[in-house]
Design a protein with these regions (language model features):
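C-terminal, surface-exposed recognition/capping segments
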Residues: 1-29, 33-167
């Protein structure tokens, strides 16, 4: 999904991004700076723009950047090339406080039509706007040699790992 969009698509680009124009130089929603678009001071996705909420129902939503940071810091992370015999590569997080385990597949990301990092990297959107530039949003990012969270272009097709919605 592109950030703030609720349907997958074949091509991911600024030209077909729902909330931007002019190659990402002007945002039409989720903008806090006059110089970068139409200001609405929204820092988190509305429910109707949350891919998890729209596709999986009211009990689910995309995590905030703070929740992704807590997940990152609250687990010991290991890379696997073959999670539980499935042949799927990704990161396994082992909770530092209980026996919970989470697996995040290295699903890559799509820019244009190509997913060149499938099996090598993972990128999981948060619901939070990137503070440094309005054309980016926060996401959890990893490969076998790093795991971190960062912000980057909203138009790219990245994964969504839903969390339970507390309503």
């Amino acid at each position: 999904f592109a950030w703030g969009e609720t349907e997958p698509k074949k091509i991911y680009s600024w030209e077909n991004y729902k909330w931007g124009r002019d190659e990402g130089q002007f945002m039409t929603k989720y903008c806090t700076k006059d110089s970068e678009g139409k200001v609405d001071n929204k820092h988190e996705l509305d429910k109707e723009d949350d891919a998890a909420f729209v596709n999986w129902g009211k009990d689910w939503r995309m995590p905030t950047a703070k929740e992704e940071e807590e997940l990152l810091e609250g687990c010991v992370w290991e890379w696997t090339n073959n999670y539980d015999g499935t042949g799927v590569a990704g990161r396994v997080g082992f909770s530092k406080t209980n026996s919970n385990i989470i697996f995040l597949p290295a699903a890559g990301y799509i820019s244009g039509e190509e997913n060149s990092s499938l099996g090598n990297e993972g990128f999981y959107w948060s619901s939070s706007l990137f503070k440094n530039t309005m054309n980016g949003s926060y996401f959890l990012s990893f490969a076998n040699y790093y795991i971190d969270w960062r912000g980057n272009k909203r138009y790219a097709g990245r994964s969504v790992r839903a969390v339970v919605n507390d309503h």
